[in-house]
């Protein structure tokens, strides 16, 4: 039985950047039987809470977008939390989905799964071909484990569990917490606050040389619903825009758009992160999907 507009669909993490975009895309397409729970309602780190939720709600389809996320500093400062919390969340949800007969699950990973110095653009087959970027290896290891668990359950139990790896995201519902946000929302907040307070200079980490690709969250939501409707394979699939710019260019654009009149200082004593990260999304595009926002 295939996905229908009345199918019972659970979006884990539906208030996050990715999860809320999935929710909007589902609603836009006419899906009307959606389930979303805040962490205070169902703590996905609690095995009994997850079991009770699946037993009572009986979702037919699951988007697993719930995760503990953050930037370089958060990953460096809280490696144990990033590794354990993400492993725990995805293990509980994926296994409960198997045991309760979920028809299809989509696990949402991250582009940080790829080796630090992998060839560019990043193709799916480059997974586990070299050492990870040290600044986010804990999150990456958890996401790799999630991919492999979906593959293992497909092989052993015949579960239709798929995985998608998005590039860097931006959009409504992003996290602007200075301790836990990613590069773009962190910059937006920093330059906005500097403008409001009249600070003459803004300091950014690193050299500004790393290259990054960005995708609007609504494009991601559209892509993930497209995959849930059209893709069924063991191999995970990249989701990107195929456009990149340097962190320095990003900072200059944010500064200009916000109207910040001061200067930008680059603190090269702080880490840059991965030198370049551009996804090869040709497999997804060959299926008939392409970004609308970019």
Model-derived features: positions:
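Conserved Rossmann-fold NAD(P)-dependent oxidoreductase catalytic core, especially the SDR/UDP-sugar
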Residues: 91-136
């Amino acid at each position: 039985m295939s996905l229908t507009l009345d199918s019972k669909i659970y979006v884990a993490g539906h208030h996050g950047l990715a999860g809320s975009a999935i929710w909007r895309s589902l609603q836009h397409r006419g899906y009307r039987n959606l389930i979303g729970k805040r962490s205070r309602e169902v703590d996905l780190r609690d095995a009994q809470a997850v079991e009770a939720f699946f037993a009572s709600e009986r979702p037919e389809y699951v988007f697993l977008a719930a995760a503990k996320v953050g930037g370089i500093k958060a990953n460096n400062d809280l490696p144990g939390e990033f590794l354990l919390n993400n492993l725990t969340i995805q293990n509980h949800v994926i296994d409960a989905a198997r045991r309760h007969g979920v028809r299809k699950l989509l696990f949402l990973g991250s582009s940080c799964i790829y080796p630090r110095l992998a060839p560019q653009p990043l193709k799916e087959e480059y997974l586990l071909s070299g050492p990870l970027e040290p600044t986010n290896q804990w999150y990456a290891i958890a996401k790799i484990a999630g991919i492999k668990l979906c593959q293992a359950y497909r092989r052993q139990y015949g579960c239709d569990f798929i995985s998608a790896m998005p590039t860097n995201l931006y959009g409504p519902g992003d996290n602007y917490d200075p301790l836990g946000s990613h590069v773009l929302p962190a910059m937006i907040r920093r330059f906005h606050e500097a403008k409001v307070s009249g600070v003459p200079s803004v300091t950014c980490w690193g050299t500004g040389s790393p290259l990054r690709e960005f995708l609007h969250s609504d494009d991601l939501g559209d892509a993930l619903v497209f995959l849930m409707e059209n893709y069924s394979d063991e191999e995970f699939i990249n989701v990107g825009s195929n456009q990149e710019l340097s962190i320095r260019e990003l900072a200059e654009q944010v500064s200009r758009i916000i109207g910040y009149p001061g200067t930008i200082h680059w603190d090269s004593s702080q880490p840059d992160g991965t030198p370049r990260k551009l996804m090869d999304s040709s497999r997804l595009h060959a299926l008939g999907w392409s970004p609308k926002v970019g």
